[in-house]
Amino acid sequence: MKILYLLFAFLFLAFLSEPGNAYKRCHIKGGHCFPKEKICIPPSSDFGKMDCPWRRKCCKKGSGK
């Protein structure tokens, strides 16, 4: 019975996180996953697909200074 409780807790925590937070490689670079059609205008950085889902790319907004 304890195994079922542990399994339920693990599944609950696994589905609790937001989908946008699942793409660690992109977020480590300071970016977010955007539709591929979006153009990253300088001073933004376009990191390409990285670990973003299908038809999306990693883009970091520039500082705008």
UniProtKB/Swiss-Prot annotation:
Keywords carried by this UniProt record: Antimicrobial, Disulfide bond, Ion channel impairing toxin, Myotoxin, Neurotoxin, Potassium channel impairing toxin, Secreted, Signal, Toxin, Voltage-gated potassium channel impairing toxin
Transmembrane segments: none
Presence of the UniProt keyword Repeat in the record: no
SUPFAM superfamilies assigned: Defensin-like
InterPro entries, A to Z: Myo_ane_neurotoxin_sf, Myotoxin
One term under GO cellular component: extracellular region
Tissue expression summary: Expressed by the venom gland.
Complexes and interactors: Monomer.
Protein name: Myotoxin-1
